[in-house]
């Protein structure tokens, strides 16, 4: 598990998506879309599983807790990473965001 500071609370506006990068314990770079909905934070892999497009450039749907790919419109659950609409059929990675004081941390868990 890798815990990386990704910024201060005020760096992440409400109803916004921010692209961040973090390096895990094995030296692999992860690009992650961090979404803020109200006081809740979500983090998913930033690349659409259907097209190699940045999800952080897409549309955030607060009420559905989904992030829509800007290329073909697949929406991904911010809670599970599962696609909610076609053409994507594979999930994207989900990570944890932790708030400590005014600092936000991204938790990357290594999967076997």
Cite the ranges covered by each PLM segment:
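Amphipathic, hydrophobic secondary-structure cores in small proteins
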Residues: 57-59, 74, 83-86
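N-terminal pre-ligand scaffold of iron-sulfur
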Residues: 1-62, 78, 93-112
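Positions that flank functional sites
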Residues: 63, 84, 91
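C-terminal "cap" of GNAT-fold acetyltransferases
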Residues: 75, 89-92
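Flexible, glycine-rich terminal cap/loop adjacent to redox cofactors
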Residues: 53, 70-75
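Short loop/turn motifs at secondary-structure junctions and domain boundaries
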Residues: 66-67, 87
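Cys/His/Pro-rich metal-binding microdomains
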Residues: 49, 67-70
């Amino acid at each position: 598990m890798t815990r990386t500071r990704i910024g201060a609370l005020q760096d992440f506006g409400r109803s916004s998506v921010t692209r961040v990068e973090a390096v895990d314990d094995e030296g692999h770079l992860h690009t992650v879309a961090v979404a803020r909905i109200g006081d809740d934070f979500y983090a998913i892999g930033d690349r659409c599983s259907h097209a190699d497009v940045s999800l952080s450039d897409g549309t955030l749907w607060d009420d559905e807790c989904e992030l829509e790919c800007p290329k073909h419109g697949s929406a991904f659950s911010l809670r599970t990473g599962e696609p909610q609409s076609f053409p994507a059929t594979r999930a994207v990675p989900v990570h944890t965001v932790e708030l400590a004081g005014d600092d936000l941390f991204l938790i990357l868990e290594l999967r076997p």
